[in-house]
Amino acid sequence: MSRVGKRPVAVPSGVTATVDGQTVKMKGPKGQLQFVVHDDVEVKLESGQIKVKPRLETNRARALYGTARAQVANLVEGVTKGFEKKLEITGVGYRAAMQGKNLQLALGYSHDVIYTIPEGITITVPKPTEITVTGSDIQRVGQVAAEIRSYRPPEPYKGKGVKYVGEFIFRKEGKKK
């Protein structure tokens, strides 16, 4: 069984943390985030540390308090360092470009895919075949990266499509004559 929840989350200098009932709010150099903790989990702010523990000794509460602690730790990391996901585009004629506040993707369709960038997320295109998604909320960064990937997921025969950097694509052999 994991013991992640037992470790307190340190609040670094430059970050202000407030706990109001079940809501944990963080404010730092990269922005402001908040997270509502489940009712079965108790959250306390004590001497620059946030401590998470289950209210009851039920299996559900014990299962949730480690998750709640990890979510609070992600809030701290998000407002200090931020999060980043990198995507890679593979395929002939497949490319990405910024078009104002939108991301324009040429992915082999008869039309270009225009992705509107949500607020709080920054997308950069260092090369036409690379996309970098950054932001302070780990969930939103991952969601945006997954939405972009879903326009053309990598296929198993040639590996064409949009994939995460470092993602392994299971390759298949083509049919034989």
Curated annotation (Swiss-Prot):
Pfam families: Ribosomal_L6
Keyword Membrane set for record: no
GO biological process, one term: cytoplasmic translation
Keyword rRNA-binding: yes
Annotated function: This protein binds to the 23S rRNA, and is important in its secondary structure. It is located near the subunit interface in the base of the L7/L12 stalk, and near the tRNA binding site of the peptidyltransferase center.
Subunit record text: Part of the 50S ribosomal subunit.
PANTHER family: 60S/50S RIBOSOMAL PROTEIN L6/L9, LARGE RIBOSOMAL SUBUNIT PROTEIN UL6M
Name of the protein in question: Large ribosomal subunit protein uL6
Species of the source: Bradyrhizobium diazoefficiens (strain JCM 10833 / BCRC 13528 / IAM 13628 / NBRC 14792 / USDA 110)
Chain's gene name: rplF
